């Protein structure tokens, strides 16, 4: 009997797949760890632990290690709150159970594998897609095989070694997600798009190379997606099993293929779904009216996309690519208004240009222009925070201002770097304190004048109060010192979707 079959037949749990705490708001199904679990099914015993559901994650892990003999603990790690909990838990496990092997995967360790492995409490990093690589690592460790054959693996062998990158895996070739490993009912909730909303992933990658994007750094302009038929069938299963009536597509670029989008929209028309996804503005603008009508008729309620900047020069520095221009955004805002689909335009303000203050004022004027065309348009504001992307002009421009990342995980726990992770108050040596204040103050006034649709706890009275408080400032372009706006938003616990989920 092979080691993997022995592991699968044993009563204990060999592997814990951990999704660290990321949000205090509505939890989403931890699709990333379920994707890893899919390749372990029938081979190794494993448990999925979600820090967004289990607020005693350390105690749960300790119990499983003690009572069931867990040998491997694997964390998926995004920058921000997940990184903080992953560091603390990994350190505790290493101190209390030094024989347990600790593996990290996800965007943060993919971009910072050397820093992660410099910590004595992380043994291995799986870079990029780990769907098959993680299982291959366990195979090698359980059967005494060579580590050099595991694609995307980084490990310590006298020095840090990085194996060849895992080629992008077509999701059509992957096994179905083991939803039975989590209590799906706990992840279904009320959102702006529906009363029983679930998250779903239908594609990987993106065909563009934006210089501020971790997806572009990992996938290098490649994209692949499930068929429209498969997506529609899966959503029908969710509806029949759990009464789901709304779907958030967490793809990095759901709308890459117009043919797939049209077929999907036609397949789910009349089935009682509403849905949300992420897109490229120029891709959507090129869609035929027939596709737009089908999307609207099928329940497409809101689309998130990167407007980024109202400056063609800044878009070029970002390597936005495609055919996107500021005019693209204005035309799309009008088109989406006609079809009754709400656009969520995200902006990345404060890029390291010689004219950063002038660019900011241009972006503020541009955002106001969008709101005149389509008052329903949601505006999401981020401050540019560099992504480890060695051949990107934008990243190199940041480094020219002496920007550099922390070289230890302990330094990533410092308050300024935790704020950096959330793209709200990043470490940006090229931005003055006055410029940062200008961005934050404009955002406060904008959010008061146009409260986000996604904050469901705001009733008509609260929304009216916000609008009244923000209207005079917005109307006169008076953004400095909006203390009354900040106080009201604090009292109403105003939520920002870019921080707490859309």
For the regions a protein language model found, what residue spans apply to each?
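N-terminal [4Fe-4S]-dependent radical SAM core
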Residues: 2-15, 150, 156-199
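Structural recognition of alpha->loop->beta junctions
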Residues: 115-132, 294-303, 362-383
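Glycine-rich beta-alpha loop elements in corrinoid/cobalamin-binding modules
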Residues: 14, 39-40, 44-167, 390-391
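Flexible glycine/acidic-rich beta-alpha junction loops that bind and position SAM and/or redox cofactors
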Residues: 112-113, 208, 259, 313-318, ...
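A short, glycine/small-residue-rich beta-strand->loop->alpha-helix junction that serves as a flexible
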Residues: 22-31, 78-83
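Radical SAM [4Fe-4S] cluster-binding motif and immediate context
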Residues: 179-343, 349-353
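Radical SAM enzyme core and accessory elements
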Residues: 1-17, 62-71, 92, 99, ...
């Amino acid at each position: 009997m092979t080691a993997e079959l022995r592991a699968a037949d044993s009563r204990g749990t060999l592997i814990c797949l951990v999704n660290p705490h990321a949000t205090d708001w509505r939890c989403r199904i931890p699709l990333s760890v379920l994707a890893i679990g899919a390749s372990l099914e029938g081979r190794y015993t494993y448990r999925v632990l979600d820090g967004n559901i289990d607020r005693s994650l350390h105690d749960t892990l300790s119990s499983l290690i003690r009572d069931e003999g867990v040998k491997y603990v694997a964390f998926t790690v995004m920058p921000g709150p997940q990184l903080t909990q992953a560091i603390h838990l990994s350190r505790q496990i290493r101190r209390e159970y030094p024989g347990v092997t600790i593996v990290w995967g996800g965007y943060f360790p993919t971009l910072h594998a050397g820093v992660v492995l410099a910590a004595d409490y992380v043994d291995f990093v799986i870079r990029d897609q780990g769907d098959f690589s993680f299982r291959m690592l366990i195979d090698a460790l359980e059967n005494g095989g060579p580590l050099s054959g595991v694609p995307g693996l980084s490990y310590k062998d006298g020095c840090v070694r990085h194996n060849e990158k895992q080629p992008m895996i077509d999701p059509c070739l992957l096994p179905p997600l083991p939803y039975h490993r989590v209590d799906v009912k706990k992840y279904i909730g009320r959102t702006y798009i529906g009363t029983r909303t679930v998250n779903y992933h239908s594609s990987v990658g993106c065909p563009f190379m934006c210089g501020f994007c971790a997806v572009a750094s990992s996938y290098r302009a490649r994209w692949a997606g499930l068929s429209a038929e498969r997506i529609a069938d899966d959503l029908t299963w969710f509806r029949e099993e759990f009464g789901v009536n709304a779907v958030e597509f967490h793809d990095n670029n759901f709308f890459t293929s117009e043919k797939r989008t049209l077929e999907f929209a036609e397949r789910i028309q009349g089935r009682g779904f509403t849905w949300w996804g992420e897109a490229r503005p120029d891709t959507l603008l090129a869609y035929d009216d027939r596709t737009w009508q089908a999307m609207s008729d099928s329940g497409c309620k809101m689309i998130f996309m990167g407007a980024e900047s109202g400056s063609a020069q800044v878009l070029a520095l970002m390597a936005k690519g495609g055919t996107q221009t500021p005019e693209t955004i204005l035309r799309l805002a009008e088109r989406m208004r006609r079809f009754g689909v709400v656009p969520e335009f995200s902006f990345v303000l404060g890029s390291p240009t010689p004219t950063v203050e002038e660019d900011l004022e241009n972006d503020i004027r541009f955002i106001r222009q969008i709101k005149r065309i389509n008052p329903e348009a949601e505006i999401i504001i981020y401050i540019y925070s560099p992504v480890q992307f060695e051949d990107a002009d934008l990243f190199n421009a940041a480094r020219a201002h002496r920007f550099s990342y922390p070289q230890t995980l302990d330094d990533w726990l410092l308050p300024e770097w935790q704020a950096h992770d959330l793209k709200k108050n990043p470490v940006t040596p090229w931005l003055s304190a006055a410029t940062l204040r200008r961005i934050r103050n404009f955002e406060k006034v904008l959010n008061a004048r146009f409260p986000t649709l996604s904050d469901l706890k705001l009733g008509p009275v609260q929304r009216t109060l916000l609008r009244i408080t923000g209207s005079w400032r917005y109307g006169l372009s008076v953004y400095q010192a909006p203390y009354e706006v900040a106080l009201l938003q604090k009292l109403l616990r105003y939520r920002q979707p870019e921080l707490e989920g859309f």
